[in-house]
A protein has these predicted regions:
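Bacterial N-terminal signal peptides that target proteins for export
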Residues: 2-14
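Bacterial N-terminal signal peptides
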Residues: 12-23
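A general, composition-driven signal for non-globular sequence regions
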Residues: 2-5, 21, 69-70
């Protein structure tokens, strides 16, 4: 009888121990990221789905690409995010690797009474002249010539830009530098530039809010923000001289010829690409993570999150009009993870 009782106790203890071990093994590691506002809607959607699937959480701070680079460089987050790819020498200096996680489009948005969404037509040089302060009125002959039949008001244009360090601004100004020699020589490109005119909003959210509130305004935001905030967006003339509307198909067309393996850190810039359907201000958003992981469990969880998102998040991306990374690019990214991201002992964490 005593022997049987001891066996039962051992069995119960074993079950409790096994349960405790399983519970410990299943404990999820929460991770932190910070940076670009451009991909925030899709990262938030992926994070919610990933939490439900795995129990692991992501706290992503949508603070702008400049802030994301600062935080990952300072090692205060597990990964940074930027729409402006870091140069190879800067990645090397800071011990970082970079990979593209999602693609999308930056669109000009406007608040103009009587002009429907998608009705206004703009060229890159015209947008540059508006932000240079040369085209000041909505009924300027240059705008009217491109938009016959639209009742453009005799109203001042209020240009809205980004006040923070922004990858969206990098894509916007990189494009304008390609299509306007005057823009390139006076303002140039960057995550933050010295604007000639306009009011600044913080984040894509801030620009969207200003455009929604200010009658006669124009701004630039990632397409998901335009849709979420029900903002009117313009058609644009692309490199092939075709007028195109923003859509995931046209973003895909712009990315079709990208050679991700040819640039250090896969830092391909997709603005002003050829192709009849190409949207002219298309770009990728990049993830930055340290090669040498001082907290390998956190590093592993970052890679698990993006691995899961690449495999399971394509429809979510499509629903928000982002463009998921193609399978061959994902395989290239995974090979970089395997060969370059290691723990303190030099062992790969992927």
């Amino acid at each position: 009888m005593e022997k049987r009782r001891v066996m039962k106790l051992k069995s119960a203890f074993g079950a409790l121990l096994a349960g405790a071990l399983l519970s410990g093994a299943a404990q999820a590691v929460d991770i932190t990221g910070a940076g670009a506002t451009f991909p925030y809607p899709i990262y938030a959607k992926w994070a919610d789905a990933y939490k439900k699937a795995t129990g692991a959480g992501l706290n992503y701070q949508s603070i702008g690409s400049g802030g994301g680079i600062k935080q990952i460089t300072a090692k205060t987050v597990d990964f940074g995010a930027s729409d402006a790819p870091m140069k190879g020498e800067d990645l090397e200096k800071n011990g970082l690797i970079q990979f593209p996680a999602i693609m999308g489009g930056v669109v000009p948005v406007y608040n103009l009474k009587g002009v429907k969404s998608g009705e206004l037509k703009l060229t890159g040089t015209l947008i540059a002249d508006i932000y240079l302060g040369k085209v000041k009125m909505w009924n300027d002959p240059a705008i009217a010539k491109l938009n016959p039949g639209i009742g453009l008001p005799n109203q001042a244009i209020s240009a809205v830009n980004r006040s923070d360090g922004s990858g969206t601004t990098f894509l916007f100004t990189n494009y304008l530098s390609k299509v306007s020699a005057e823009w390139k020589s006076t303002i140039g490109e960057g995550t933050a530039v010295k604007w000639s005119t306009g009011v600044g909003g913080k984040g894509n959210e801030g620009v969207a809010n200003y455009v929604a509130r200010i009658d006669g305004s124009i701004g630039y935001v990632e397409y998901a923000y335009a849709k979420q905030n029900k903002l009117s967006y313009a058609q644009m003339m692309n490199k092939d001289g075709q007028l195109v509307v923003p859509s995931d198909d046209n973003f895909k067309a712009a990315a079709a010829g990208a050679d991700w393996n040819s640039v250090p850190g896969m830092g391909v810039v997709l603005t002003d690409q050829p192709g009849k359907a190409s949207w002219p201000i298309t770009g990728a958003s990049f993830i930055l993570i340290h090669k040498r992981q001082e907290k390998p469990e956190n590093g592993k969880e970052v890679l698990r999150f993006f691995d899961w998102s690449f495999k399971n998040g394509a429809k979510m991306a499509d629903d928000l009009d982002y463009v998921p990374m193609p399978d061959p690019v994902v395989k290239l990214i995974q090979s970089v993870w395997k060969s370059q991201i290691k723990d303190a002992s030099g062992k790969s964490i992927y």
